[in-house]
């Protein structure tokens, strides 16, 4: 299939980009962009270089590659970003033969990957803070049931991510300007991540074979504190993970790194 844009919802950013797809392929790579929950300059197009490396340079056309966009703050608030991503997954799984799924999340895309692992608790608590009646309980339950039955991953790649927003603000108080755009309260911030939540203590609900944490040593926006916190969280719970660093460029360059793309390709 040639490249294609498909909508999974009614809004402009509720869309996916099909970089490559064939029903005969038995692996699918999903790519999920960052941008601080709010930056329209970030989209599934961030991963064009990675897709081109895998498909053109390495000739790995036996891999489906699909990018997900989601609505942005301040127009929507947490946990609606996560609901959009799960809705996109339902659309993909209902309409395409994906085979074995792996996913790359960059920056807050990596945050969303972590949230996916306990999507029920995080969405329910987030909606309580948001005080909204949409989506309905019935709509959410249908989505939750589908995800529970159908979504598993071979590999999750967490790329220069944010895993504990509370700790992020302690380290970088100036980042408050974009965090407040995405969250309605301090409680919403704390309960959005397993590393800081207080109301839950749940095991991950989505099966994942491999956790790959990657962080560029040249990242000018995020220190190694965030990936170290996440790696410790996993290790404390006896969950195996790989934690790698390298000179892969600045924050908005790391997903363009051929070394990162090669690592993704080799570990699917």
From Swiss-Prot:
Its EC number is 3.5.1.9. It catalyses: N-formyl-L-kynurenine + H2O = L-kynurenine + formate + H(+). One of its GO terms (biological process) is 'de novo' NAD biosynthetic process from L-tryptophan. Keywords: Hydrolase, Tryptophan catabolism. Pathway: Amino-acid degradation; L-tryptophan degradation via kynurenine pathway; L-kynurenine from L-tryptophan: step 2/2. The keyword Hydrolase applies. It comes from the Eukaryota. The keyword Hydrolase applies. The active site is at 107 (nucleophile), 219, 251. Pfam families: Abhydrolase_3. Disulfide bonds: none annotated. It is an enzyme of class 3 (hydrolase). InterPro entries: AB_hydrolase_3 (IPR013094), AB_hydrolase_fold (IPR029058), GDXG_lipolytic_enzyme (IPR050300), KFase_ver/fungi-typ (IPR027519). GO terms for molecular function: arylformamidase activity. A motif (HGGXW) lies at residues 33-37. SUPFAM superfamilies: alpha/beta-Hydrolases. Belongs to the kynurenine formamidase family. The main chain amide nitrogen atoms of the second glycine and its adjacent residue in the HGGXW motif define the oxyanion hole, and stabilize the oxyanion that forms during the nucleophilic attack by the catalytic serine during substrate cleavage. Homodimer. Catalyzes the hydrolysis of N-formyl-L-kynurenine to L-kynurenine, the second step in the kynurenine pathway of tryptophan degradation. Kynurenine may be further oxidized to nicotinic acid, NAD(H) and NADP(H). Required for elimination of toxic metabolites. This is Kynurenine formamidase. It comes from Scheffersomyces stipitis (strain ATCC 58785 / CBS 6054 / NBRC 10063 / NRRL Y-11545) (Yeast).
